[in-house]
């Protein structure tokens, strides 16, 4: 305690001594009426994350001499005149003189001893002006508070000072506003980027309080959230070193105030704030057009390449150029390249500009004369656009206006896709709750709930995810007469952010699951359970779920679902696992084989698809079985980044009324003694379809058949026995771009674009004679991530370009035998995967007499062995029975 008090006393004495210097009138870092000579050095180093890299390979150093004259002073105010001379830049031992910096001085005004404005010539380039702001910011040293905010070249920053001695001070900067200037970003953390920044400034003063040395050291780490070892590390130092006192006489401006002194300069100069502006030249795209890049990529953009990483990589390379392309140019490309139209409309959806939107609709939509092929392409465009994270508001307004036109009402599928896209884009736009557009879209969708097709609007509300619609969805979930309405409403509610629900909502979900007021479809009950569990159940609620397992409810498939869901959560969360075990031990009537050995075929599981050094991806599979037949199933691919996760793709299958075709699941030789669940509806229509969600955007569902007549047509005609594409598209995944201003004034530009190309196809074989069926679903995915970083100023630049390509594939085979009892065997397989990573770091000396460039390349690859995923013991037993004679 005594040592601590001594340390505090020492700090206070140092601070008092330092403040004493300030009070004695020796506050100026540059002595009034004097000339001081300094040397300025700025070094910027770019390193690749994940491996050792020599700083000398990708770095530059800028050096110059500064002559600082104090040309006006009064009280604590001062005007400094700064001349830059003898400038040079060096990279990899190659030094180049800079002769283009004008010999005109710039000025720094100081108010109460602190830099306030930069007065510079209007013709100077942006990066040089930023450098001048950086020089001025190094003179910002204040000790009137231990922690506060300061405005300097990096914007508004939180700062704190640490007085080391009477002549040495350390300043720490945090959370500067210009360290994260976002242009585009993905709201899903797992699909975003992570940035860490810090800066420390060291000051050394003379015994009189004048500046001898100022040194800024800042670090910026930029990486993919889902793959932290991929990205860049930028280090920058800015050093101002006092050399000597100048010998020239400093002519003073004989004016009565600082404002008048500044005013006298404004014939040729302008006044600028300390806060920097982005130097747009750092992100300027080379002289290349979208048409040139498209022609160079045509071989990778063919329909046969869908599902391959080569197409995804070509796709993301086109995005930056496409975002600066005009409508007329898009129209020409659509006309000239008809052979790759499907890929072009995917691209234009990802562009998210009004020019791309107008070109697409102008080319494809002909109102009543629109052909079926054009309608398909328009739907494809809308599906790509629906994944957009920063759509132009005018696009949303145009699509919403289309819904009122009579011509589009005749194209039912297109109209539904427009509704789903409008809902998704409205959510992605992040509109204020009082925004008129949000209110109009919400009102339109809520009115649709009373139409003849309420499920369409319920799906749209799922995409909108507006908390103001929760009550309406809950009402449909609890009072809807048709089972599919309750299921759709709960499926929509499950998509909402967890923070949208309150305790009243939780009670209503419990009421649905436990059927306290009425009976509900089994899918509605399992969806309600999912929401309750995602809201983190209390100890009492968990105990109630365990007690339910031993209840007399005869819906054994739901009990199986509950048990598997609880076990899955226990595997993932240590806290929940401890709670689960403690509650289970308390219940002897539950903790026995009779209850825990549930009889159902329903399966809930999660499996690791890949992990570091590849991406951390898991598969979440839910197969809800009814009378031995798959009633509702889903396979969802989740990308993880720390504690956050994002759904990259979700495939759902739903069926109804198929039990009559396969007979009684309990008849037979007794191999499959599964008691039938309670009947919910005896006259259920025979239907089946597919639901697809891409990065949380629910697409228009695909209906396989509706009615027994249509089903039997497929059975006898064998129309589903050949592999048929169900979904083929390339969509944007990562879409992040932002700028950082370094203390030296150099601009850093970072852009990360990612795409996923998906080819989903399947086939079904059905034999009433042999009483069996076979289903095969194949998903081929090609993903690519392209990163670009550039940092520098007019005369030097560092660049890093990296790419990651990956082709994860998955196949699901299901064999159903209902010749004697019902036996269902599912096999989930993943073939070998290869992840490739390339990286190129470059240094450029430019706008000098002899330009210089150097490139450093590296590659990395990682193989993941193929495997067949274990599902559960019941599935293993079924597979052994079906294939015992093979």
From Swiss-Prot:
Catalyzes the transport of phospholipids such as phosphatidylethanolamine (1,2-diacyl-sn-glycero-3-phosphoethanolamine) and phosphatidylcholine (1,2-diacyl-sn-glycero-3-phosphocholine) between membranes. Required for the assembly and secretion of plasma lipoproteins that contain apolipoprotein B. Glycans are attached at residues 358, 484, 502, 616. It comes from the Eukaryota. It holds the Pfam family Vitellogenin_N. One of its GO terms (molecular function) is phosphatidylcholine transporter activity. This is Microsomal triacylglycerol transfer protein. One of its GO terms (biological process) is synaptic target recognition. PROSITE patterns: VITELLOGENIN. GO terms for cellular component: basolateral plasma membrane; endomembrane system; endoplasmic reticulum; Golgi apparatus. Residues 30-653 form the Vitellogenin domain. InterPro entries: Lipid_transp_b-sht_shell, Lipovitellin_superhlx_dom, MTP_lip-bd, MTTP, Vitellinogen_b-sht_N, Vitellogenin_N. It catalyses: a 1,2-diacyl-sn-glycero-3-phosphocholine(in) = a 1,2-diacyl-sn-glycero-3-phosphocholine(out); a 1,2-diacyl-sn-glycero-3-phosphoethanolamine(in) = a 1,2-diacyl-sn-glycero-3-phosphoethanolamine(out). It is found in: Endoplasmic reticulum; Golgi apparatus. It comes from Drosophila melanogaster.
């Amino acid at each position: 305690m005594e040592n601590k008090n001594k340390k505090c006393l020492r700090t206070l004495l140092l601070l008092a001594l330092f403040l004493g210097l300030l009070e004695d009138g020796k506050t100026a870092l540059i002595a009034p009426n004097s000339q001081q000579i300094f040397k300025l050095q700025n070094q910027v180093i770019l390193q690749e994350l994940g491996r050792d890299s020599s700083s000398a390979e990708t770095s530059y150093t800028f050096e110059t001499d500064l002559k600082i004259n104090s040309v006006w002073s009064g009280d604590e105010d001062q005007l400094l005149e700064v001349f830059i001379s003898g400038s040079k830049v060096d990279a990899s031992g190659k030094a180049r003189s800079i002769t283009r910096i004008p010999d005109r001085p710039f000025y720094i005004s100081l108010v109460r001893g602190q830099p306030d404005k930069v007065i510079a010539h209007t013709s100077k380039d942006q990066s040089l002006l930023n450098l001048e702001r950086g020089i001025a910011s190094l003179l910002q040293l204040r000790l009137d508070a231990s922690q506060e905010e300061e405005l300097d070249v990096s914007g508004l920053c939180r700062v704190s000072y640490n007085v080391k001695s009477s002549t040495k001070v350390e300043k720490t900067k945090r959370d500067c506003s210009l360290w994260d200037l976002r242009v585009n970003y993905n709201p899903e953390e797992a699909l975003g980027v992570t940035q860490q920044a810090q800066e420390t400034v060291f000051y050394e003063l003379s015994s009189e309080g004048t500046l001898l040395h100022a040194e800024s050291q800042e670090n910026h780490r930029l990486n993919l959230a889902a793959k932290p070892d991929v990205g860049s590390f930028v280090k920058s130092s800015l050093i101002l070193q006092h050399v000597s006192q100048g010998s020239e006489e400093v002519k003073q401006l004989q004016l009565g105030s600082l404002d008048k002194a500044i005013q006298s300069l404004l014939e040729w100069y302008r006044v600028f704030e300390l806060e920097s502006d982005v130097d747009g030249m750092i992100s300027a795209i080379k002289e290349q057009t979208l048409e040139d890049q498209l022609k160079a990529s045509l071989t990778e953009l063919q329909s046969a390449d869908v599902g391959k990483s080569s197409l995804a990589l070509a796709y993301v390379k086109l995005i930056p150029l496409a975002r600066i392309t005009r409508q007329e140019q898009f129209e020409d490309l659509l006309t000239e390249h008809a052979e790759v139209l499907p890929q072009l409309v995917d691209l234009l959806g990802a562009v998210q500009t009004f020019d791309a939107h107008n070109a697409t609709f102008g080319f494809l939509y002909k109102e009543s004369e629109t052909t079926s092929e054009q309608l398909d392409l328009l739907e494809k465009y809308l599906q790509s656009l629906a994944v957009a994270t920063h759509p132009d508001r005018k696009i949303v307004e145009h699509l919403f206006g289309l819904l009122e036109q009579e011509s589009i009402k005749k194209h039912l599928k297109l109209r539904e896709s427009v509704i789903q896209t409008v809902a998704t884009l409205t959510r992605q736009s992040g509109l204020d709750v009082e925004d008129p557009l949000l209110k109009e879209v919400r009102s339109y969708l809520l009115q649709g709930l009373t139409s003849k097709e309420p499920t369409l609007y319920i799906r749209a509300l799922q995409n909108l995810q507006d908390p103001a619609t929760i009550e309406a969805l809950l009402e449909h979930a609890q009072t809807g007469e048709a089972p599919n309405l309750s299921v759709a409403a709960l499926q929509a509610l499950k998509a909402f952010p967890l923070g949208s629900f309150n305790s009243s909502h939780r009670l209503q979900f419990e009421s649905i699951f436990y059927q306290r007021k009425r009976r509900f479809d089994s899918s509605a009950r399992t969806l309600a359970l999912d929401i309750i569990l995602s809201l983190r159940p209390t100890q009492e609620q968990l105990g109630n779920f365990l007690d339910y397992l031993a209840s007399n409810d005869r819906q054994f498939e739901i009990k199986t679902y509950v048990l598997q869901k609880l076990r899955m959560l226990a595997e993932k969360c240590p806290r929940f696992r401890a709670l689960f075990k403690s509650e289970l031990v308390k219940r002897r009537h539950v903790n026995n084989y009779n209850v825990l050995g549930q009889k159902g075929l329903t399966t809930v599981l999660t499996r690791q698809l890949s992990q570091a050094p590849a991406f951390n991806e898991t598969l979440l599979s839910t197969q809800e079985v009814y009378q031995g037949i798959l009633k509702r199933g889903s396979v969802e691919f989740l990308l993880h980044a720390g504690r956050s996760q994002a759904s990259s793709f979700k495939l759902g299958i739903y069926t109804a009324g198929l039990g009559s075709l396969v007979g009684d699941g309990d008849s037979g030789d007794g191999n499959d003694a599964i008691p039938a669940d309670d009947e919910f509806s005896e006259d259920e229509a025979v239907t089946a379809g597919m639901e697809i969600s891409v990065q949380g955007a629910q697409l228009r569902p695909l209906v396989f058949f509706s009615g027994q007549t249509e089903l039997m047509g497929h059975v006898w005609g064998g129309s589903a026995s050949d592999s048929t594409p169900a979904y083929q598209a390339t969509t944007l995944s990562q879409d992040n771009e932002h700028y950082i201003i370094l203390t030296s004034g150099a601009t850093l530009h970072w852009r990360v674009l990612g795409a996923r190309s998906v080819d989903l196809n399947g086939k079904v074989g059905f034999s009433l004679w042999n009483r069996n069926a076979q289903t095969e679903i194949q998903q081929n995915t090609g993903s690519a991530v392209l990163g670009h970083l550039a940092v520098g100023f007019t005369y030097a630049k560092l660049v890093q370009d990296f790419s990651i390509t990956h082709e994860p594939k998955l196949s699901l085979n299901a064999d159903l035998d209902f010749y004697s009892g019902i036996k269902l065997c599912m096999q989930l397989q993943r073939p070998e995967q290869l992840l490739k990573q390339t990286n190129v770091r470059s240094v450029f000396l430019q706008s000098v007499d002899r330009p210089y460039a150097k490139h450093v390349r590296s590659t990395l690859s990682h193989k993941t062995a193929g495997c067949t995923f274990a599902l559960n013991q019941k599935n293993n037993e079924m597979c052994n029975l079906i294939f015992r004679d093979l």
